């Protein structure tokens, strides 16, 4: 053993990776047995040290990194900045979401990276740190959620929620964060269970495909292999690909063979091949193995658990299936739309090496936007950059299609990102639609960058040509569905309050095409420091006044009004009971509408019963006379009595029982006496017959029908009798006579003799005396209006009336209603109370007022009939004022010029309801205002009437009223009424001009002009309704102006002007004055001398290619779809991840996009296909190459999914699965059909042998089968039936007469035979038998001489007596070929 001094001592932390490397080196040098003892000692040592250290995990050990606070604060500031830019209209919704997601993603990742260094510095023995860093329990991501931040979550649809969880589990989550956390719990209990079950089923399918593949041969003799190169692979990945594989072709370096064929590759040879940078290495692979139903030792390579070539008889198929399926539980299950977390097509960032100024040629770049909405330059071709500092010059070359993030001649700092270079191979993307919804109600406007013509006919979809803004101007849309209304005021009229704005016309005409009125009432807000928002108030008033009309008023003089408990009654001496008044709150009556009701007590009943009509006649009238039933609280119609007569009421007792029939003491169709106990708490009040009827679930209706039972003798007449009313004095059954009205009801029990029940009936008569119209004959002089008295019956014939809560029921009501004939043009009547004092007594009367239209003009011709008069005059002269819109605020009418379909829209501009923005607060020396170069030189004709022109020696007399400086100047000016440019400055440059001539120019404030004024005309309206013309001047005599206004000397002599356009759309916080910039976004609708008024608006940025869902000038409601943005999203790594992706590949399901890079693919195809053109075998070879390339691509795609999740799987396992997926071919219809049926699936190796044996080849084409379908198309029908579709597989095998040769593992297990793998393999059995024979033979030879001879000739004797491995394989080969011949003969 070596001395301890010479041993190498590794002083480093042994984490999970280091332990893996140590175990690998131990196995490579000492083997598994020795390594096991070493690992047992390490385990014991670890437990001992953990016990001595008393390591435990407590909640106090969860320490948050101190950098978290400022990291989150920095991210929040960046998020607020993005929100501001979005409000300014600089970013659209997708760019804002990308910025937000990437900011919080970077913050979370940086905090995760800071976690371990923080633990290492502050508390290296922290249990959480040791647990996660060593890999004993928990990953870095899990610990990050405990002590860092939870981060971004996804919603149930897979979209990233833009509200990150800033807290961790140690700090505790808020309610909102907890709900979001529940949404984004990707590895919850449900997901884990589903993922485990999916991975288990995937493993079962994989094992089902390859369960029969066993190593049964050393070398299959193939000359093919797969090519691996060292160009695009990383060193570690390429080394893992090489170790454990066997070389298929000799590898030469400078004509010297460094690795022969059939040599396995170890770690030393792999490192040597990587160091020498060997371009192409051909490796033997299960994909190219020539064996049919098994695999050879050299094509498989090493056993990963032993580090040597695989042993004979090893079931490598099952190992491969379990190796791929078991890590499925570690893969993600769901699909996530990250929305731009990964940059994707950006390969690298270019950073500056030092501080300096950057220079480049601007002709080779053009402006564009980054994916975050930032301005950038796109390179046409290769762009040369020069970075200059004082002592250094650095040159850079930026490739085309790259983004340049800096300006020319800009100062850049060291390590600053100045460019983003795109990757050569662009990742797969998909176009996604993002719907933007309006969060403001108002009117839509856009610029000329939108195609105003709709994309389709009769559509409101408009395409955005270039990046532009869509504006929603705030407002509330008020639409009138009635007829055309008249707007009384014109544009720019001032209105006071309260005043009518509109009136609605009701035209008596037959015109069909009537337009509608749309009132567009804008919501403006008063923006103050305390941010109080006041909405404008507009009210709708119902007016009953009609122009040029006559009123008809009359009073019910004989009736006094009395009030009892909030009810009003009409009392009269001749009435036994008062009239109850029924009037609406607004006091309006329509024609034939009831206004008073009389309930006669003689028509009230106290008992339940049935109503029967006699000889009266009733009529169901309109719904205006519906009344509320006091019993059921439901509205029901009244029945007007049109002919006097009588009706009858038949009393009975009715009880509703909610108990079962067992609790009822009496039986059905039995006669009981008064006072009989019905239930435990109900007794009957009268004698009568009991009738019980079921009404619902456990509900019964019990009736007691009062009367006398009579059994008639003449039974033959019973069937002809019906239930009828018998008048008094008539004999019943020729035996007795009734004195009162009687009701005969026949009862026919099922088991007893029929009988008749003689029931009493109460008669009610209605005569003309009930109609008290004489009492209301009040309008004898005026025949136009009358009050009608109508009797109403409240129940219909044969209706059952039930008493509830012992309340009496009214049967008849007498109602009063107002009636006028249609020839009089009355529409409504107003009812009011009139209080009159007579002899110190106050009496209240009822007054009814009617309004008649009198604006008809009669024509002179007497021959015109009434019908013609109505038709002609009603169409042209009649208008009734129905609705008015009244304004409660003072303001100005402004009519919108955009008219659609004849609809009217107008705005009321009120100074108290708008944003009033003052231009400046105070005067200082540093007033700076921007200039407008387009302002033309103007001339002033006269300053004012009060401005007096004096001689040189005299002073100028100026009135303070007209020329007070500051905010008092031109205080009386009103709103402007134009839509063109207007120029203002901090001081007043507005002047009122009256049309008088200029007397002298010597001492005028304005110098002489050179050009005439080219500005448009402006008008101001003052309070005296005087219109003044406005002209703008720029050249001013400063000396005279300073003399007039001393404060003017504070300013510079050069005054700059700033242009503000009336109607201009301004973004939030636009700069007008340096004293205030916190303005909301909106449209300037009015400009005064000291302030301007802004209509609030919201801009939405939209990029080219997006679509707008409404027309220009239309009204948008809050929440309506406004814009559809089109943006690109990564598809390959984002949309389908983990287990679904693996399952999609293994099941050979088609995908939407191409799975390889087309650009490089076509170049490779062009190079490979040149040698096949004109070759008879060209199609065959190209098909073979494409199939081989498809196999390699499928292996790479599956491997990428596992590598992206951090799972390492050897390629040979995946290659075994793919080999079985591509081992079948499908026969074609061309050629021979007597051997195989067209469309039949057969093995590829079997097809090749058949084509060599037959004269005419069988045409076929390769096919890629999924693992499920491949499992159902094997040589063993027992294996197929045990997997899926047992009945179908067995029936199909029976019809075909299939024979199972039991070559696989599964069919032997099912039948209880020896498994042909491991010790059950034929090769292994023969070798074991051979060893036993050797031992027996050697034991018999014990003589010394014989042993010496045997030692000398041991090789020859052994060779001659016992078979070698080659002999065993030859014998097996002959037996296998014999089995194949038997299969073929069958």
Swiss-Prot record:
Pfam families on file: RNA_pol_Rpb1_4, RNA_pol_Rpb1_5
As for subcellular location, the record says: Plastid, Chloroplast
Q: What is its main location?
A: plastid
Q: What is its EC number?
A: 2.7.7.6
Assigned keywords, A-Z: Chloroplast, DNA-directed RNA polymerase, Metal-binding, Nucleotidyltransferase, Plastid, Transcription, Transferase, Zinc
- Annotated Zn(2+) binding sites: 220, 289, 296, 299
Per its record, the protein catalyses: RNA(n) + a ribonucleoside 5'-triphosphate = RNA(n+1) + diphosphate
Cofactor or coenzyme needed: Zn(2+)
An annotated GO cellular component of this protein is:
mitochondrion
Query: Molecular function terms in GO for this entry?
Result: DNA binding; DNA-directed RNA polymerase activity; zinc ion binding
Q: How is the cofactor bound?
A: Binds 1 Zn(2+) ion per subunit.
GO biological process assignments:
DNA-templated transcription
Annotated HAMAP family: RNApol_bact_RpoC2 (MF_01324)
Give the family this protein belongs to, as stated in its UniProt record: Belongs to the RNA polymerase beta' chain family. RpoC2 subfamily.
Q: Quote the subunit structure annotation.
A: In plastids the minimal PEP RNA polymerase catalytic core is composed of four subunits: alpha, beta, beta', and beta''. When a (nuclear-encoded) sigma factor is associated with the core the holoenzyme is formed, which can initiate transcription.
Cited function: DNA-dependent RNA polymerase catalyzes the transcription of DNA into RNA using the four ribonucleoside triphosphates as substrates.
This chain belongs to the protein called DNA-directed RNA polymerase subunit beta''
The scientific name of the source species is Marchantia polymorpha
> What gene is this protein translated from?
rpoC2
């Amino acid at each position: 053993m070596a001395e301890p001094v010479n041993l190498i001592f590794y002083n480093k932390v042994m984490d999970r990776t280091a332990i893996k490397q140590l175990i690998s080196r131990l196995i490579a040098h000492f083997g598994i047995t020795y390594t096991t003892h070493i690992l047992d000692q390490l385990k014991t040592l670890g437990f001992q040290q953990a016990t001595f250290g008393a390591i435990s995990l407590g909640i106090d050990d969860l320490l948050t990194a101190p950098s978290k606070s400022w990291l989150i604060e920095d991210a929040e500031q960046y998020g607020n900045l993005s929100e501001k830019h979005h409000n300014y209209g600089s970013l659209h919704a997708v760019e804002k979401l990308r910025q937000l997601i990437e900011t919080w993603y970077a913050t979370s990742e940086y905090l995760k990276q800071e976690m371990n260094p923080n633990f290492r510095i502050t508390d290296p023995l922290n249990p959480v740190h040791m647990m996660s860093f060593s890999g004993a329990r928990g990953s870095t991501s899990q610990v990050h959620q405990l002590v860092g931040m939870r981060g971004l979550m996804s919603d149930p649809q897979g979209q990233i929620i833009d509200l990150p969880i800033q807290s961790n589990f140690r700090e505790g989550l808020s309610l909102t964060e907890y709900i979001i956390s529940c949404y984004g719990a990707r590895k919850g209990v449900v997901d884990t269970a589903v993922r485990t079950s999916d991975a288990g089923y995937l493993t079962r399918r994989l094992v089902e495909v390859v369960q029969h593949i066993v190593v049964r041969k050393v070398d299959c003799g193939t000359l093919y292999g797969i090519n691996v190169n060292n160009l695009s692979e990383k060193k570690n990945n390429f080394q893992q690909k090489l170790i454990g594989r066997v070389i298929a072709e000799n590898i030469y370096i400078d004509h010297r063979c460094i690795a022969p064929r059939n040599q396995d590759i170890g770690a030393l040879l792999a490192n040597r091949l990587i160091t020498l940078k060997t371009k192409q290495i051909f490796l033997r692979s299960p994909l190219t193995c020539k064996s049919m139903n098994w695999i050879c030792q050299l094509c498989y390579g090493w056993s990963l658990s032993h580090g040597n070539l695989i042993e004979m008889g090893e079931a490598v198929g099952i190992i491969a299936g379990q190796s791929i399926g078991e890590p499925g539980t570690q893969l993600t299950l769901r699909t996530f739309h990250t929305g731009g977390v990964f940059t994707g097509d950006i390969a690298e960032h270019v950073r500056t090496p030092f501080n300096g100024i950057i220079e480049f040629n601007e002709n080779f770049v053009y402006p564009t936007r980054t994916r975050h909405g930032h301005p950038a330059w796109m390179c046409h071709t290769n762009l040369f950059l020069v970075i200059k500092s004082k002592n250094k010059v650095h040159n850079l070359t930026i490739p085309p299609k790259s983004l340049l993030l800096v300006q020319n001649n800009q100062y850049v700092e060291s390590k600053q990102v100045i460019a983003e270079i795109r990757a050569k191979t662009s990742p797969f993307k998909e176009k996604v639609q993002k719907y933007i919804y309006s969060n403001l109600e108002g009117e839509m406007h856009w610029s000329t960058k939108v195609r105003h013509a709709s994309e389709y006919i009769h559509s409101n979809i408009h395409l955005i040509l270039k990046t532009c803004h869509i504006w929603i101007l705030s407002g509330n849309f008020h639409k009138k569905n009635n007829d055309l209304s008249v707007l009384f005021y014109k544009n720019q009229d001032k209105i006071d309050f309260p005043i009518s704005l509109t009136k609605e016309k009701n035209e008596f005409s037959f015109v069909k095409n009537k337009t509608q009125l749309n009132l567009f009432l804008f919501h403006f807000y008063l923006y103050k420091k305390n941010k109080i928002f006041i909405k404008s108030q507009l009210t709708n008033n119902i007016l009953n006044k009609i122009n040029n009309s006559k009123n008809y008023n009359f009073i019910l003089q004989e009736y006094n009004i009395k009030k009892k408990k909030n009810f009003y009654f009409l009392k009269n001496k001749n009435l036994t009971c008062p009239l109850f008044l029924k009037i609406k709150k607004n006091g309006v009556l329509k024609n034939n509408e009831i206004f008073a009701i009389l309930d006669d007590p003689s028509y009230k009943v106290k008992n339940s019963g049935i109503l029967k009509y006699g000889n009266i006649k009733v009529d169901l009238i309109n719904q205006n006379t519906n009344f509320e039933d006091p019993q059921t609280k439901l509205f029901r119609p009244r029945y007007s009595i049109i002919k006097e007569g009588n009706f009858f009421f038949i009393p009975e007792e009715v009880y509703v029982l909610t108990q079962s029939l067992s609790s009822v003491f009496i039986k059905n169709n039995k006669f009981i006496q008064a006072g009989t106990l019905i239930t435990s708490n109900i007794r009957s009040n009268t004698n009568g017959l009991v009738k019980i009827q079921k009404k619902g679930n456990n509900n019964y209706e019990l009736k007691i029908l009062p009367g006398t039972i009579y059994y008639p003798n003449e039974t033959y007449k019973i069937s002809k009798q019906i239930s009828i009313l018998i008048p008094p004095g008539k004999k019943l059954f020729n035996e007795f006579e009734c004195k009162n009205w009687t009701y005969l009801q026949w009862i026919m029990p099922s088991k007893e003799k029929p009988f008749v029940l003689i029931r009493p009936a109460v008669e009610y008569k209605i005569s003309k005396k009930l109609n008290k119209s004489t009492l209301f004959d009040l309008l004898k002089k005026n025949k136009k209006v009358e009050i009608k008295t109508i009797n109403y019956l409240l129940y219909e014939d044969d209706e059952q009336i039930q008493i509830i809560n012992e309340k009496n029921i009214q049967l008849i009501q007498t109602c009063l209603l107002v009636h006028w004939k249609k020839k009089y043009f009355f529409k409504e009547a107003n009812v009011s109370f009139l209080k009159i004092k007579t002899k110190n007594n106050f009496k209240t009367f009822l007054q009814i007022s009617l309004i008649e239209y009198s604006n008809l003009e009669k024509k002179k011709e007497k021959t015109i009939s009434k019908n013609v008069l109505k038709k002609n005059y009603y169409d042209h002269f009649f208008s009734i004022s129905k609705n008015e819109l009244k304004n409660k605020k003072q303001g100005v009418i402004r009519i919108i010029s955009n008219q659609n379909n004849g609809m009217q829209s107008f705005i009321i501009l009120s100074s108290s309801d708008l944003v009033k923005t003052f231009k400046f607060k105070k005067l200082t020396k540093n007033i700076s205002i921007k200039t407008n170069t387009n302002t033309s030189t103007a001339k002033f004709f006269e300053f004012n009437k009060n401005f007096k022109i004096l001689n040189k020696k005299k002073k100028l007399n100026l009135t303070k009223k007209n020329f007070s400086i500051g905010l008092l100047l031109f205080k009386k000016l009103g709103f402007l009424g134009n839509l063109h440019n207007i120029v203002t400055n901090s001081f007043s440059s507005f002047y009122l001009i009256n049309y008088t001539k200029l007397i002298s120019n010597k001492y005028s404030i304005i110098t002489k002009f050179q050009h005439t004024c080219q500005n448009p005309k402006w008008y101001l309206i003052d309070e005296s309704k005087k219109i003044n013309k406005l002209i703008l001047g720029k050249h001013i005599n400063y000396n005279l102006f300073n003399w007039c206004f001393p404060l003017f000397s504070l300013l510079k002599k050069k005054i700059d002007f700033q242009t503000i356009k009336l109607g201009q759309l301004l973004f939030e916080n636009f700069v007008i004055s340096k004293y205030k910039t916190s303005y909301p976004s909106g449209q300037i609708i009015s400009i005064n001398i000291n302030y301007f008024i802004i209509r609030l608006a919201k801009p939405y940025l939209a990029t080219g290619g997006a679509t707008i869902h409404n027309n220009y000038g239309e009204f948008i409601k809050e929440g309506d779809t406004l814009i559809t943005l089109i943006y690109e999203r990564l598809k390959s790594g984002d949309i389908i991840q983990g287990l679904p992706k693996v399952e999609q590949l293994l099941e050979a399901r088609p995908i939407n996009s191409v799975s390889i890079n087309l650009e490089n693919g076509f170049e490779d195809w062009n190079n490979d296909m040149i040698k096949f053109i004109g070759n008879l075998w060209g199609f065959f070879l190209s098909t073979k190459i494409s199939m081989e390339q498809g196999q390699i691509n499928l292996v790479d795609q599956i491997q990428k999914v596992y590598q992206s999740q951090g799972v390492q799987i050897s390629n040979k396992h995946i290659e075994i699965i793919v080999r079985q997926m591509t081992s079948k071919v499908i026969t074609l219809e061309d050629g021979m059909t007597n051997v195989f049926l067209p469309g039949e699936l057969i093995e590829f190796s079997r097809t090749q042998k058949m084509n060599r044996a037959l004269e005419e080849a069988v045409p076929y084409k390769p096919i890629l089968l999924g693992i499920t379908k491949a499992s159902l198309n094997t040589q063993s029908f027992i294996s197929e039936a045990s997997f899926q579709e047992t009945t179908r597989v067995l029936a199909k095998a029976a019809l075909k007469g299939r024979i199972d040769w039991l070559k696989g593992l599964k069919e032997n297990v099912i039948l209880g035979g020896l498994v042909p793998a491991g010790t059950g393999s034929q090769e292994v059995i023969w070798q074991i038998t051979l060893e036993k024979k050797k031992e027996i033979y050697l034991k018999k030879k014990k003589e010394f001489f014989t042993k010496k001879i045997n030692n000398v000739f041991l090789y020859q004797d052994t060779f001659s007596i016992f078979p070698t491995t080659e002999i065993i394989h030859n014998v097996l080969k002959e037996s296998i070929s014999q089995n194949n011949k038997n299969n073929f003969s069958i």
